[in-house]
Amino acid sequence: MSTSDDIHNTTATGKCPFHQGGHDQSAGAGTTTRDWWPNQLRVDLLNQHSNRSNPLGEDFDYRKEFSKLDYYGLKKDLKALLTESQPWWPADWGSYAGLFIRMAWHGAGTYRSIDGRGGAGRGQQRFAPLNSWPDNVSLDKARRLLWPIKQKYGQKISWADLFILAGNVALENSGFRTFGFGAGREDVWEPDLDVNWGDEKAWLTHRHPEALAKAPLGATEMGLIYVNPEGPDHSGEPLSAAAAIRATFGNMGMNDEETVALIAGGHTLGKTHGAGPTSNVGPDPEAAPIEEQGLGWASTYGSGVGADAITSGLEVVWTQTPTQWSNYFFENLFKYEWVQTRSPAGAIQFDAVDAPEIIPDPFDPSKKRKPTMLVTDLTLRFDPEFEKISRRFLNDPQAFNEAFARAWFKLTHRDMGPKSRYIGPEVPKEDLIWQDPLPQPIYNPTEQDIIDLKFAIADSGLSVSELVSVAWASASTFRGGDKRGGANGARLALMPQRDWDVNAAAVRALPVLEKIQKESGKASLADIIVLAGVVGVEKAASAAGLSIHVPFAPGRVDARQDQTDIEMFELLEPIADGFRNYRARLDVSTTESLLIDKAQQLTLTAPEMTALVGGMRVLGANFDSSKNGVFTDRVGVLSNDFFVNLLDMRYEWKATDESKELFEGRDRETGEVKYTASRADLVFGSNSVLRAVAEVYASSDAHEKFVKDFVAAWVKVMNLDRFDLL
C-alpha cells in the first residue's frame, strides 16, 4: 500500500523522475556559471574554433583546394545568378547586383582597425549575431541564393571568399572595373566570441560619436554596420551625421575620400526596401521558427517580397540606372532640391522635390518615381569637407571610379593581412601601404650561418632577459583578427614601435643586434631578433639542466620606414601586455581580462598562455625589469618556479593599495614580504580554470613538460606572421 509520500515519489512506481516533464532538461539548459558570476574571466575565448567544430578536419588545406577551382567558371556562374530572379525572392529590375554588393559590404564592414577584429575573413555573416543583425535584414536571402553555387563548387571556395567575390562580380556585371580580388579567407564553423559588439542590451541603441572615438566599436548603434541612415538617433539632419560617419569609417581606417567613395559607390546600384510598416516583419533568423530553415524576417505585408519587400523600412532608389554603374549619384545629389519626407514604412528620407520622375520602378516598367536619398547621403553635400570631395567626384567621374575601386578593395581585404596571404588569378600587383608591405628577401642563411650567428649573439653580452624581451617585443604585436603585426619586417626598429613605452627596455638590445646583422651580412635584422630569443631560451633551458633545441625558420625580411604607416601601426601599441606585466591604462577592463585579450589576439590556448607567462616571469622579461611575478631566486633559468611558488600556501597575498593592481606575498609565519605580483600573475592561482593548468606545471614531475610546452608556445608566437611557412 502506498503512502502519501509515495504519491510524489516517482521512483516508487519505477518511473524516472527526469522523464516527467517540467523545466528544460536538455544539456546546457538552466542557470549557468555566467548567470551567477557575470564578471567571470572569459578563459573560454581561448578555446574557439577548435578542430572539434570543424567538419573538414585538421588536415584540410583550403589553399590546396582553391588551386583546383575553376575560378572563371565560378565567376561565370555568379554572373548568371545575378539575373536569374527567383519567385521566393524576386530580383529588383531583374538583378541581384545591389543585394550582393550589400552582402559583401556588410560582411567586410564589421572590421575595426583599433583591434583588428570583425571583417569578412571568416564568413561570420553565417552566424549570430551578424546573421540576425538589424542592419542585415534580407541578407539571409542573398546567402541562400548563393547556396546552389557553393554546393556545386564545394570546398574549393569558402563561404567567406564567395561572399566577397559575389560582390565583386555584381559590380563588374554592372559595368564597373574593380581593382582586383584576393582569395584566401578560410571559413570557421561557429560564431566569434571575442568580438566586443558593445554593452547595450537593446538593438539600435544610440552611441555618441565621441564615445566611438574611444572604443573599438564600428557602428553608431547596436545592430548597425555603420551609421543610422536616418541620422544619429533618427535626427533626420544630414549635418548631424557627419561626425558619426567619420567616427565609424575612421574606425575602419578609412579617410574622408575613401568614405565618400564608399558611400556613393555603394548607393549607385540597387535600392532600399520599405514598402510598408516594419511591424509586418517577423523574427530574425536566430529567432524564427524551425520550419523557416535559417531564413528570417518573413513579412506579412502583401506578398512579402518583390514590390512588397520590407528591409530597412526606407524606400530609396538613388540613380536612374540602378543596375548599371554611373555617376548619377553625384549628379542627382547636387542637381536637385531635397525635401525631407517619410517612406511608406515611416522612415525619414529625402525626395528630390524639383526632379522629374526619372527613376524606374523595380517591378513595373510603366511606372517612374523621383530620385530619393538617405539622410546620410545628403551629408556628402552639406558637410563642407565631404562636399569638396563629392564635387570633385561629380566633375571627374574617373577619379570617383578609381577612388571607389581602391576603397572597395581595401574594405573587402582589410582584415586579410599582408598580400602574401592572397591567392587567385586576380590579385593586384601593386603594393598598398595598408597591407603593411614587405620587401623581397635578400638573405638566405645556411645552417652554418645560423650557428655562427647564434654564437655571436650568445657572446654579445646581452642577458637572457634582454634576449627574450627583444624577441617578444618584436613578435607579440601580431593580431590574429587582421593578421597584422609580428616579427617579420623588424618594425620594432622603426617608428612608431621603437618609441613605445612597453618596448623601452627591449629596444636597448637593438643596437647590439643591429651591429651583429651589419657585420655578418648573413641574415635580416628580423631573423636575428627572433634568433636572439632562440639563444635566450636555449641558454635558460640549459641553465635549468635541459638541452633543448628551439626551432628556427629563417626567411624574414626588414621593412623600410616608408613601408610603414605610422598612424595605422600606432593602433598595434598595447594598452596592456600581461606577458610582460605591462599596463598603460587602468580605465579599460581588468588586467586579467586584458591578458586574455592579448592571448586571444596571439591565437594562444589557455595552456599556451599559462606556460608563456610562467616562463617569461622566471626569465625576467617584465617590460620595466620589475620583480612583479618573478617568483624565483634563479632569474634567467627556465624553471617552473613561478607555478611552484604561486601555489605555495606558505604565502598569503594582500593588495598594496586600493587599486588592487599590485600585491605583496608575505610569509604567513614571519610576515616577511617574499614576492610582489600583479593581477596578471595572481590570476593563475585565483581563476579555477587557469589554476587547474598551473597545478599541472607546478607538479614535481612537470619541469621537462613545462619547458617543452613553453618552447612550443614561444615558437608559435615567433612564427605567427610567417605565412610563407603554411
UniProtKB/Swiss-Prot annotation:
Tryptophyl-tyrosyl-methioninium (Trp-Tyr) (with M-252) crosslink site(s): 105-226
GO MF, one annotated term: heme binding
Gene name tied to this protein: katG
Manner of cofactor binding, per the entry note: Binds 1 heme b (iron(II)-protoporphyrin IX) group per dimer.
Binding of heme b, residues: 267
SUPFAM superfamilies: Heme-dependent peroxidases
Broad class of enzyme this protein falls into: oxidoreductase
Superkingdom of the source species: Bacteria
Reaction catalyzed: H2O2 + AH2 = A + 2 H2O; 2 H2O2 = O2 + 2 H2O
Subunit structure: Homodimer or homotetramer.
Biological processes annotated in GO: cellular response to hydrogen peroxide; hydrogen peroxide catabolic process
Protein name per Swiss-Prot or TrEMBL: Catalase-peroxidase
